Amino acid sequence: ELCHKYNVTVISDEIHCDITNPGKEYIPFASVNDVCRDISITCIAGSKVFNLGGLQSACVVVPNKFLKHKVERGLNTDEVAEPNAFAMSANIAGFKYGDEWVCKLNNYIYENKKIFCDYVNKNLPKLYIIPSEATYLLWVDVRKYTDDATTLCEYLRSKTGLYVCEGSEYGVNGKAFFRI
């Protein structure tokens, strides 16, 4: 409502939308109400859920006709709306026939996240894992160990071979976090 009031368009990156914990449901931003639908541009892709990132394809969903015209013009002006036939076929196949795959993938990811969380809670109790109901990524608060996750990430890489993303890559407020 605030975005609508001030004529702000919401670009909703929902690329991880199909990766949810078992029993959890993805709710598209544009489906929340008519206002959300009318001010939204939603970006989705099969790249995460079907491991198709190398095919470099995505979808842009724009329900509002005025916004859709602007998006189409922008994409076509810059010649970035030209997916190859293989990418289109792979995405269509994934979304049309991939329900069983998605269910098994989500269970597998959920179990892996549980293993990680159980290990951390038992062995590194000062780390705090931000609760998550979706995606395969975890956001970890390291403030009880250090204020600088970058140093911790470098240590983890050199001593264990584990590569994690420094939270500072996502803005100054992320400097005491890492993403795995």
Predicted segment positions?
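Anion (oxyanion) recognition and catalysis
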Residues: 4, 121, 157-158
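Active-site pre-lysine segment of PLP-dependent enzymes
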Residues: 1-6, 16-52
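Conserved C-terminal alpha-helix-loop-beta "cap" of PLP-dependent enzymes
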Residues: 127-128, 140-179
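Glycine-centered flexible beta-alpha turn that most often forms the glycine-rich phosphate-binding loop
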Residues: 13
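Conserved glycine-rich beta-strand-loop-beta hairpin in the small C-terminal domain of fold type I
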Residues: 85, 92, 108-117, 128-142, ...
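Conserved core segment of the aminotransferase class I/II
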Residues: 34, 38-110, 117-119
